[in-house]
Amino acid sequence: MDLQNADNYFHAFTYPNWKHIVSFGKRGEGPEEMLSAETFQFNSLDSIYALDANKMQISRWAISAKDHSATRQEVIRLDKNLIRSLDFCATDSCFLIPDYLGEHRYWQVDYSGKPIRSIGKIPTEKDLASEIRPALAQAWRSFIDYNPHNGILAMVTQLGESIEIYNTKENTHTVLYGPNG
């Protein structure tokens, strides 16, 4: 991922030789272009999902080392209720997307971009008024990762205030607080 690019947000390389295959995810305002690139996730060895928060969409790209090409296979437009989605994890049945309004901790979103359900709340040891939840959600922006083998979603706030472990298979949630949590 290239955030300081002039033309393309993504560059694919061979491994372990690191030979350039293709640049893709053209920067721009056109229908086939991207306004931004917040994150990406490998879908398979030759396919990635990429999030464009400004267009509120996730694109799936197929990459061919043989043809030196990247083709947009799918565009998933996110529902307007998913305001400013900045991260995601794909599971076998849905996307998991943090809620940056602070009403919930994250959303389960179907592969059409529609919310299925919201889960959890912002971890804090104090009961905070609802009017400050959006600010807290932005301040506690989390890094997220999902392990498809055991159904574990881990969320860690950027400054380490909390670590959350959601077991999506057993429907359990554990929160560990840091010194400023």
Located regions from the model:
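Conserved beta-strand positions in repeat-built beta-propeller and related beta-rich domains
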Residues: 2-5, 14, 50-54, 97-101, ...
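Beta-propeller fold detector
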Residues: 20-27, 69-78, 116-125, 130, ...
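Blade-loop segments of beta-propeller domains
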Residues: 19-54, 74-79
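Asp-box/WD-like beta-propeller blade repeats and closely related beta-sheet repeat scaffolds
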Residues: 55-104, 124-125
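Structural signature of eukaryotic scaffold interfaces centered on beta-propeller domains
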Residues: 1, 39-43, 85-91, 136-149
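Beta-propeller domains
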Residues: 2-25
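Short glycine-/Asp-/Thr-/Trp-enriched loop segments that recur within the blades
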Residues: 29-36, 79-82, 125-138
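Short loop/turn segments that connect beta-strands within beta-propeller blades
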Residues: 15-17, 62-66, 110-114, 167-171
